[in-house]
Structures are given as structure tokens and as C-alpha cells.
């Protein structure tokens, strides 16, 4: 693929990621507004969020299989269109069940985005620069989370009803679907030719290495989700005012935005294994440091923790292409993203139950130690992944 086409593909996928992650995470801002508008109780609020997350987790793997026949670009455009239409319908919702249905379909549409965009980028950057490209794409999603949530907050402060920005987001989704279809080449062109027969099965070149990569993802995802869920509670336990503690997660995410990009660059320059070791050791040390430092010192450390905590994901996604045949990438990415989504559902519950038994500080300490299990797993990858050439 020519460099200009690769760049256009990356830009389009980054824009799509901004829209989809914005649509997915704006629900955090919308939930209290929906509860106030429709008189919802906390159980109903939880059901709304769960419906969206379950749809995203459940449909990622089917999307990977369907894309192998339908084409990654085509299914990505269709899913983006579905999410846009669902958000327009959400803007005209009349009650709880309509909200549930619209956000379920929005989650179904967004489920295709991560595995298919990652596959498309991997096709556009099959060799050098793939991890940097995926790190850039990974960074773009966090931009969407901040922008969409910020737009709703500003509209509410300005006296504009939440329905207006929600419908606007839906229109943005439809426009993005058209852009995807127009600007990304037909990814069915990457299907095997007669000269290169179709790979049977999952197309995994090195099953032990792929399994180890999935295990790294499991440990990394559970640590990340658990830490983000309970860091504010740790700060409150240290005596930090609740208003400051509420800013803990945004601070981690701000650092994480930088980490997602720069860790992809580091992996391209210094190799996958070294980068995983650096980021996971830094993550463990950072988490344990939040226990050792005074309250406000911990607060200001959080962006640095976020760089390492969030950055490993770019390395993981950028490594899948080394282990899987190109025509089987959609299902491979779907597996890894589904693993992360399931961990995001289970980890808060597991760490929450543990915290009730042994306390918040010991629970955070366990998370900081468990993340170091990624180090021996990273060594399993060494034999399968050649160190990328330094530019």
C-alpha cells in the first residue's frame, strides 16, 4: 500500500476511533441526566450501562468472523452507521426500555470498531511502523472520550438539553460511516489469492506465543481496570478531599493518552519484550508508590502511573500481526479485545470483593504485585518475535 494511502487509512481509523469511543464513554456523563429525566433508580442505571457493555463484549468475536467474508471496511462502516442511528434514536427516547434497546444497538455497532480498525491498520502497516500506527490509533480513542463527554457537560452548563448533543453525536456517526466507506480501500482485497491459498483454522503461527500474549493482556487489563475503579477510594482513605479524589481517574487517563502513543513508538524502536518489561515494571512500581506516598503526593503521581498503566495495550495490539496470518487478523484482534472487555467486567467485582475482606490498601498492593506476572509471560514471546529494526 502506498504511503499516502496508509496515512489516509490511519487518519480515517483514528477519526472513527474518536467517534466510537466518544459514543461508548459519553454514557458515563449521560447516565445521571437520563436518571433525572426519566426518574430512574440506581438498578436501572446499572442495567443501562451493562446492556451497552455486554453488547460490545458479545459481538466483537462474531464481528471478526463476519469481516473475513464481508470485508473489514464494509462491516466497520455498517457498525458505525448502526451506532449513529442508535444515538439518534436515544435522543428521542421516551423511557427506560427504549434507552436499553438503543444503547444495546449502539454497543453492537461499536463492537466492530476495535478489532476491525486494528486489522485495517495492520494491513496498511504490515511491517515497520505498525506499533507506532496502532499506538496513534489507541491514543485517538481517549481523545473521543474527553471530547464527547466535555461537549455534553458544556451543553448542560449552557442550559441546552442533553438530547441535542446526543442527536448530534448520532449524525456524526452516520457521517463517519460514509467517510469510512469512501476513504478506506476495500479490505477484501487482502483475501488470499490463488497463489496463496486461504489459511485454514485460526492462522496462528505460534500458539504458545499468542496464548502468552493473551495472558499478558488478561493481567494488564485486570490490573488497569481494578486500579482505575478503586484509586479514588485509596486517595479518600489517605485523607484526600473527595473533590480532589474524584479527579484521580481523569489524571490517570491523561497520562494514559501519552502512554498509548509513546509506548507504541518505543516498541517499534526498542522491541516488544523490552517495552513490555519497562511498562509493566513501571506500572507495578507506580501502583506500589501510591501506597507509600502521602495523599497529595500520590494524587500528583497519577499521570505518570497512567503512562505505564495504559501504554502496554498499544504494544499488545501491535504484536498480534507478528503472530497471526494477515487474513485471520480480524478474529485474532476480536479475541484479544473480547478478553480485555470481559476482564473489564470481572476485575472490578473481584477486586471489590477482595477489598471488602482485606481493605483497600492491601487490595491495591496485590494489584501492583500481580501485574509483575507479565514479566515471565513476556519471555515466552521472545522466541517468536524478532526485534524490530531501529530506524
Residue ranges of each PLM-predicted region?
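Helix-loop-helix hairpin linking two adjacent transmembrane segments in secondary transporters
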Residues: 137-184
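Cytoplasmic helix-loop-helix junction between adjacent transmembrane helices
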Residues: 102-140
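Residue-level signature of mid-helix packing/kink "hotspots" within the transmembrane helices
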Residues: 25, 53-61, 146, 253-257, ...
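Interfacial helix-cap and linker-helix signal at transmembrane-aqueous boundaries
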Residues: 34-35, 66-67, 152-160, 235-236, ...
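Structural signature of the two symmetry-related core transmembrane helices
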Residues: 74-88, 274-289
Amino acid at each position: 500500500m502506498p504511503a499516502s494511502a496508509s496515512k489516509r487509512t490511519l487518519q480515517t481509523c483514528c477519526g472513527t476511533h474518536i467517534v466510537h469511543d466518544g459514543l461508548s464513554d459519553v454514557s458515563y456523563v449521560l447516565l445521571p441526566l437520563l436518571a433525572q429525566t426519566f426518574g430512574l433508580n440506581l438498578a436501572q442505571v446499572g442495567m443501562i450501562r451493562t446492556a451497552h457493555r455486554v453488547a460490545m463484549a458479545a459481538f466483537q468475536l462474531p464481528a471478526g468472523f463476519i469481516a473475513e467474508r464481508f470485508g473489514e471496511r464494509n462491516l466497520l462502516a455498517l457498525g458505525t452507521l448502526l451506532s449513529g442511528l442508535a444515538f439518534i434514536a436515544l435522543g428521542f427516547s421516551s423511557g427506560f426500555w427504549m434507552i436499553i434497546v438503543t444503547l444495546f444497538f449502539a454497543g453492537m455497532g461499536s463492537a466492530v470498531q476495535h478489532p476491525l480498525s486494528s486489522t485495517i491498520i495492520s494491513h496498511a502497516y504490515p511491517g515497520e511502523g505498525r506499533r507506532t500506527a496502532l499506538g496513534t490509533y489507541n491514543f485517538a480513542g481517549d481523545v473521543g472520550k474527553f471530547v464527547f463527554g466535555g461537549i455534553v457537560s458544556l451543553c448542560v452548563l449552557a442550559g441546552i438539553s442533553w438530547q441535542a448533543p446526543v442527536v448530534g453525536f448520532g449524525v456524526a456517526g452516520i457521517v463517519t460511516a460514509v467517510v469510512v466507506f469512501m476513504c478506506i480501500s476495500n479490505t477484501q482485497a487482502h483475501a488470499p489469492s490463488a497463489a496463496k491459498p486461504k489459511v485454514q483454522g485460526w492462522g496462528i503461527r505460534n500458539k504458545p506465543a499468542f496464548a502468552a500474549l493473551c495472558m499478558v493482556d488478561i493481567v494488564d487489563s485486570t490490573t488497569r481496570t481494578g486500579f482505575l475503579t478503586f484509586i479514588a477510594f485509596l486517595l479518600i482513605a489517605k485523607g484526600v478531599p473527595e473533590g480532589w479524589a474524584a479527579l484521580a481517574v481523569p489524571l490517570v487517563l491523561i497520562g494514559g493518552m501519552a502512554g498509548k502513543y509513546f509506548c507504541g513508538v518505543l516498541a517499534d524502536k526498542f522491541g516488544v519484550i523490552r517495552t513490555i518489561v519497562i511498562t509493566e515494571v513501571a506500572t507495578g512500581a507506580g501502583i506500589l508508590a501510591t501506597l507509600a506516598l502521602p495523599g497529595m503526593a500520590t494524587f500528583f503521581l497519577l499521570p505518570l502511573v497512567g503512562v505505564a498503566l495504559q501504554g502496554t495495550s498499544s504494544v499488545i495490539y501491535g504484536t498480534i500481526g507478528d503472530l497471526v496470518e494477515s487474513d485471520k487478523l480480524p478474529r485474532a484482534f476480536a479475541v484479544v479485545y473480547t478478553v480485555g472487555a470481559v476482564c473489564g467486567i470481572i476485575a472490578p467485582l473481584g477486586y471489590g470483593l477482595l477489598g471488602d475482606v482485606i481493605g483497600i490498601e492491601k487490595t491495591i498492593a496485590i494489584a501492583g504485585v500481580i501485574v509483575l506476572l507479565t514479566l515471565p509471560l513476556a519471555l515466552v514471546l521472545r522466541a517468536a518475535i524478532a526485534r524490530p529494526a531501529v530506524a
